[in-house]
């Protein structure tokens, strides 16, 4: 592929990726990664993680699953991550109070249905399905402390959900601070180029 053809393809794919998006963070970085992938003739690795905090996905999940399907249609590698480890922590995102953590048995029961439900919108044979317990359950306490040493409390409080709760004097528990570290480590473990959320 010529440089001009690569530029055109990057523009085309970015337009497809932007369709229906409310927020599109890191577009310049994504364009650079996509350019490298096209030059190397390899797909982007696109991660979508969902915690099995209930037994069923809901209608809102279909929007981001359809976006994952668009990446597949563009020739990229979709990764559907079942957050079996993170569900045991409880996702604080967008919450004004602590989300209850689930025990391992509840998570296992809920996770059973997720892949079947995703298969209604995606060809799961073309999707890399993973569980973050694969690597997080193997991590030693020392490994986890080293991971957490990569950020400060001040930086964590910059997150909208935490800053609002802190300003309102709503408790933020330590395990909730750990959740974003696990999310970030998931992306590293999966060598994800793109992370979808919503």
Language model region names:
Residues 1-198:
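NTP-dependent nucleotidyl-transfer catalytic core
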